[in-house]
Amino acid sequence: MIKSKISVAVLFLLCLCWLPTLSLAKGKSHFTVEDSQYGTRLVKWEGKDSVVDFNNIQELKDVKVIGEMAFEMNKYIKQVILPDNLQIIEKRAFNTFENLQTVKMPNTVRYIGNSAFNMDHQLELSVLPDSLQEIGEWTFWDCNKVCISVIPEHVSKIGRQAFTCCEGIKALVFKNQLEVINDRAFSGCKNLERIVFPNNLREISDFAFARCINLKGINLPASLQKIGYRAFGNCESLLFVKYNSNPKVDSSAFMNCPVSQEK
């Protein structure tokens, strides 16, 4: 009798271990979700749908986290509509898509992780969520159709190479309290023509805007303390730099730039 009770207890505990992760299916869509400290987390999507609307799938409408590599290297999806209360997109979640064209993000997303949309060459994205606080490293690296123009107000960190080679970006307005623009964050954005820097900016790091070949002039904020190695290197159209402070400027910060006027 005692052995029987122990066996039942063990079986019950084993069942509990499996509860956090649920494999679910709806039609031709296949996915796995689990509980996390932030709420429901999508672990993996294995469907072949061309359009994925989380809000139309009962089991996914309350997802708070898109997990690491959840959709990585998908070749079917063209459009994603993320759930209304999503908070976190983990690293490599939508990395290296062949056909992804549009992603609709709700104004609840706080964090987009490293390489989350890396090398999504067909992705056309013009607006980031107002709720966004942090953008990881290589997040939109080589997404040459991404054309955002405003960095949201609450973004406190932009990782290295976050927007490298985003050729669709023509203007950048930093509406935030960002203090550092990290290494190569916007390097190779060859159609970038205009930048409005944030008022609290302290540092423009190495190669941050290197090879932005259509950038013609910049007005640097009074808060700026440092301009790094080749920060504007090979900006071959850059003619005008206005200083409103006396930052420490690396001797190669403007290498191969035809800067003719500095104040």
Where are these regions (language model features)?
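Bacterial N-terminal signal peptides that target proteins for export
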Residues: M1-L11
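Bacterial N-terminal signal peptides
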Residues: V10-P20
